[in-house]
From Swiss-Prot:
Modified residues (N6-acetyllysine): 104
Cysteine disulfide links: none
Region (Disordered): 76-143
Gene3D superfamilies per the UniProt record, alphabetical: 2.30.30.140, MRG domain
Organism expressing this protein natively: Pongo abelii (Sumatran orangutan)
GO biological process: chromatin organization; double-strand break repair via homologous recombination; regulation of DNA-templated transcription
Residues of the Tudor-knot domain: 12-62
Keyword Endoplasmic reticulum: no
Protein name: Mortality factor 4-like protein 1
Sequence segments annotated as region (Interaction with RB1-1): 125-191
Gene this chain is encoded by: MORF4L1
PANTHER family membership: MORTALITY FACTOR 4-LIKE PROTEIN, MORTALITY FACTOR 4-LIKE PROTEIN 1
Main localization of the protein described in the UniProt heading: nucleus
Length: 323
């Protein structure tokens, strides 16, 4: 009996594709193709992303760049935004004060390996047999790390401090119900907030290693913000404003334009993205401790970072664009 032949790849090196990262589809490029254990895998570069996020993915996470799949991409973005708004209203109650900052802020748990397909909204792929992580360092060859993430997916949950939840609700209410817009460019933009935080940490006499880690975390938050803002962090009513910003500032990172409310929205969504980073569970928990510390900083400075006076009523002509 002739040996079973290797499967034929559906995508070629250099091909423009759509690829799942978390629950959403992103434009990407197939850089390499490999067949291992009768399974086709692709080394993917997400368009516009730093090369640090290049990763090996199974064929189930890659789709052809055609109109039907582009429509699916738009539908997933819309569904994700609606789920985001609903989740915030359920989880954030104004006026409720608890010792949320003293509670454990990070919930990292390994998913039981269930075979899911991107069509079911999972966007990931797992193997039938789970294996414990074997990595001892946070930074290893990205090819090796991303191969292992197929075997061991980590679910990440970042809890928002209770002091900040009312601001999420107020932000939602001002925009979706009162039809106001956050004034742009922000008086204090995301870059400035992150720089202030880094300087604050340095002033507390951190070691060189901790200072380096803070700089890395700040750079990571900034990159996530710039990547996710246009697809996951805006309400429908804000989209015409976003289009105007892109037209007026085509080369400006959005972290130089938007401010604290949109940065806070990032932390509601960032857990789903962190599940696909090339980090082992221990390194991910360490990263989340840094994110928790940054959220504590936002809570401590919330009186100066968040204000209803930073919003303005949208003019009538804007309403016509937003319909």
């Amino acid at each position: 009996m002739a040996p079973k032949q290797d499967p034929k790849p559906k995508f070629q090196e250099g091909e423009r594709v759509l690829c799942f990262h978390g629950p959403l589809l992103y434009e990407a490029k197939c850089v390499k193709v490999a067949i291992k254990d009768k399974q086709v895998k692709y080394f993917i570069h997400h368009s516009g992303w730093n090369k640090n996020w290049d990763e090996w993915v199974p064929e189930s996470r890659v789709l052809k760049y055609v109109d039907t799949n582009l429509q699916k991409q738009r539908e997933l973005q819309k569904a994700n935004q609606e789920q985001y708004a609903e989740g915030k209203m359920r989880g954030a109650a104004p006026g409720k004060k608890t010792s949320g900052l003293q509670q454990k802020n990070v919930d990292v748990k390994t998913k039981k390996n269930k075979q899911k397909t991107p069509g079911n909204g999972d966007g990931g792929s797992t193997s039938e047999t789970p294996q414990p992580p074997r990595k001892k360092r946070a930074r290893v060859d990205p090819t090796v790390e991303n191969e292992e993430t197929f075997m061991n997916r980590v679910e990440v949950k970042v809890k928002i401090p209770e002091e900040l939840k009312p601001w999420l609700v107020d932000d939602w209410d001002l925009i979706t119900r009162q039809k106001q817009l956050f004034y742009l460019p922000a008086k204090k933009n995301v870059d400035s907030i992150l720089e202030d935080y880094a300087n604050y940490k340095k002033s507390r006499g951190n070691t060189d290693n901790k200072e380096y880690a803070v700089n890395e975390v700040v750079a990571g938050i900034k990159e996530y913000f710039n990547v996710m803002l246009g697809t996951q962090l805006l309400y429908k009513f804000e989209r015409p404003q976003y289009a105007e910003i892109l037209a007026d500032h085509p080369d400006a990172p959005m972290s130089q334009v938007y401010g604290a409310p949109h940065l806070l929205r990032l932390f509601v969504r960032i857990g789903a993205m962190l599940a696909y980073t090339p980090l082992d569970e221990k390194s991910l928990a360490l990263l989340l401790n840094y994110l928790h510390d940054f959220l504590k900083y936002l809570a401590k400075n919330s009186a100066t970072l968040f204000s209803a006076s930073d919003y303005e009523v949208a003019p009538p002509e804007y309403h016509r664009k937003a319909v």
